[in-house]
């Protein structure tokens, strides 16, 4: 389904939502039993030994699908429907920590050292910006704030219509633009060279077979060192004359390129099947992790796939990609569980799996913790985070905590004792985040119209012990972010925007509620926020803001009014001020592609000791004096208006 068509549907759904919740009482601490599976259970999933075996398996799935089509089907699997299995092993393996990134980052990532595709990155003394189908570089070395280079975010022989150029990553002298092409079919990867002076040059375009990866919360690409990582579902037609035509493959684009030029990058030996059967009534997907080595400057890729139902949420830790698939159904009157989580190691070793129930809300529902456990918040009626799936999260809430060592071939489900029943919040749009030793969650307005709730509850769960705390707030919960060793919760109460500082040491509690009158969030995605710590107890945060009462989905079509900066001093907020946009000076940019800001258009940048606001085509720099930020200059890097000026110097600065 094309994205613009989905926007209208999602908007109608959001306008029609009402608050609900059963307010489940707090339960005791989660207990993980020892001994996980049969002693002789395989530790990994089974790969296909030949192309013929894989073909036969797909034919079997086709026959099963044919038999199930007449059956009554319902969408999600209840979390309480899995039969308990033998207890799990308490053995855990040592986990790699989230090592800090050696390079300065301007991206609010989930794990340090695991970069995520975004709209702005740092390359040495340059900012690289992806905006509306074009790439831009801006010099920030020394005292500079000067546009340098601009190129289309696609090849010179490509018609960009029907393609969304969504996100970007930078590895040494390579800029990678990730998009999805409805015209050419699949993930489109543009590779560009960037030199030390920030000059951009197109290198090549490649296509990866995939279905649309878009998620309102997640990001398609990750970068760990020089390793580029993609997740994508590939929906398989087992009835096809050639079922392999939808398998992972790469094509280097050139004018006149044909589908026959795709070259498979995954042999049968890198395709895996779970021992635990799944329902094929909703179809079959190859959940594919593609890894590309960028160290040579080429696009050398390999892929690994696991077969499963189509609903999914994926999460990337420093060690593995986790893919949670959901495809449960009623057959007659009997509920059968068909949820599973796959673990696909980044070192290239074989995937493993385990049967589970329910579904996470989004990638922030996961944490692979240092003690060798996978911790996941699940809801009973979720179907994954594809498109706007995360905005329609429903059902009871549980915390799954299981040893990573309990993954095997998928033949056994997780023991019921590994799930902790949690309170279900009232409200609509569900937000969750692991911060320090706690899982935090609650509900807010999300992409809909701001609600005047007056009060809400933030639930704080100590994931290792299961202790649950309720933190009352005077506003909804639309954003949960880490702030040092504590958290900041952002949300609206009608026309006002609130920032609540939550102390997590000892008993979690709200310390400060800073209210920005007559404002709303200008960005909904995680990358719109950034916190720059100064020391353990202080720092500065930035967040795009907009006019009061603006629904969240408006950020797809309207720019933010400003970026608001707050100083944190011991969990007490002080307003530093804002750097604002000048929309009256905007000019037609001649946009040809990606003319909707699916991934946002504003972001605070704390870089090279400077404070800069990215606001559409404007970069606005500020200087903090006596606790107040003052604009010092702005540059408009738009393709038809490459001008710069200092507030104190009307003569301007030459490009």
Model-derived regions, located:
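Positively charged n-region of N-terminal signal peptides that target proteins for export
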Residues: 1-4
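Short amphipathic alpha-helical "recognition" segments used for binding
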Residues: 6-7, 120
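Bacterial N-terminal signal peptides
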Residues: 7-16
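Beta-sheet-rich non-transmembrane sensory/scaffold domains
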Residues: 17-655
């Amino acid at each position: 389904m094309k994205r613009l068509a989905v926007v209208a549907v999602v908007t109608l759904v959001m306008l029609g939502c009402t608050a609900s919740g059963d307010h489940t009482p707090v339960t005791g601490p989660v207990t993980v039993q020892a001994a996980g599976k049969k002693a002789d259970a395989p530790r990994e999933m089974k790969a296909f030994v030949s192309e013929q075996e894989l073909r036969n398996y797909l034919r079997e799935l086709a026959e099963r699908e044919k038999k199930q089509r007449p059956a009554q089907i319902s969408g999600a699997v209840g979390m309480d429907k899995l039969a308990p299995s033998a207890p799990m092993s308490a053995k855990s393996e040592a986990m790699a920590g989230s090592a800090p990134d050696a390079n300065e980052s301007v991206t609010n990532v989930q794990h340090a050292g695991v970069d995520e595709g975004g709209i702005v990155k740092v390359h040495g003394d340059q900012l690289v910006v992806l905006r509306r189908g074009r790439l831009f570089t801006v010099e920030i070395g020394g005292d500079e704030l000067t546009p340098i280079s601009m190129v289309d975010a696609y090849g010179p022989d490509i018609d960009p219509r029907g393609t969304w150029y969504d996100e970007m990553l930078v590895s040494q002298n390579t800029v990678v633009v990730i998009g999805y092409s409805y015209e050419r079919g699949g993930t489109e990867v543009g590779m560009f060279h960037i030199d030390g002076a920030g000059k951009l040059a197109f290198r090549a375009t490649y296509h990866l077979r995939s279905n649309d990866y878009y998620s309102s919360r997640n990001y398609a690409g990750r970068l760990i060192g020089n390793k580029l990582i993609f997740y994508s579902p590939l929906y398989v037609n087992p009835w096809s004359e050639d079922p392999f035509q939808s398998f992972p493959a790469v094509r280097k684009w050139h004018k006149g390129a044909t589908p026959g030029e795709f070259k498979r990058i995954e042999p049968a030996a890198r395709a895996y099947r779970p021992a635990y059967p799944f329902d094929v009534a909703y179809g079959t997907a190859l959940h594919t992790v593609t890894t590309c080595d960028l160290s040579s400057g080429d696009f050398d890729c390999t892929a690994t796939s696991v077969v499963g139902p189509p609903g999914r949420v994926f999460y990337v830790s420093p060690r593995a990609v986790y893919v949670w698939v959901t495809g449960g159904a009623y057959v007659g009157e009997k509920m059968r569980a068909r949820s599973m989580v796959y673990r696909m190691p980044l070192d290239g070793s074989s995937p493993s799996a385990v049967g589970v129930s329910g579904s996470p809300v989004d990638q922030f529902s996961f944490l692979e913790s240092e003690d060798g456990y996978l911790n996941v918040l699940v809801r009973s009626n979720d179907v994954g985070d594809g498109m706007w799936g995360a905005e329609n999260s429903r059902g009871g809430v549980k915390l799954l905590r299981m040893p990573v060592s309990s993954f095997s071939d998928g033949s056994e489900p997780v023991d019921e004792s590994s799930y902790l029943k949690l309170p279900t919040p009232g409200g609509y749009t569900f937000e969750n985040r692991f911060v320090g030793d706690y899982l935090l969650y609650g509900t807010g307005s999300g992409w809909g119209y701001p609600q005047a709730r007056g009060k809400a509850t933030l639930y704080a769960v100590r994931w290792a012990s299961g202790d649950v705390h309720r933190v009352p707030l005077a506003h909804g919960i639309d954003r949960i972010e880490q702030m040092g060793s504590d958290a900041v919760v952002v949300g609206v109460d009608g026309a006002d925007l609130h920032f609540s500082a939550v102390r997590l040491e000892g008993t979690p509690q709200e310390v400060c509620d800073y209210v920005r009158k007559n404002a709303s969030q200008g960005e909904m995605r995680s990358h719109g926020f950034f916190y720059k710590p100064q020391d353990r107890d202080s720092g500065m945060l930035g967040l795009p803001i907009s006019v009061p009462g603006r629904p969240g989905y408006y950020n797809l079509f309207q720019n933010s009014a400003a970026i608001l900066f707050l100083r944190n001093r011991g969990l007490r907020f002080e307003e530093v001020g804002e750097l604002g946009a000048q929309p009256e000076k905007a000019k037609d940019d001649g946009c040809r592609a990606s003319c909707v800001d699916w991934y946002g258009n504003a972001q605070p940048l704390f870089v090279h000791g400077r404070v800069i606001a990215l606001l559409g085509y404007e970069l606005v720099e500020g200087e903090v004096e006596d606790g107040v930020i003052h604009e010092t200059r702005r540059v408009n890097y738009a393709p038809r208006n490459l001008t710069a000026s200092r507030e104190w110097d009307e003569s301007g600065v030459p490009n």
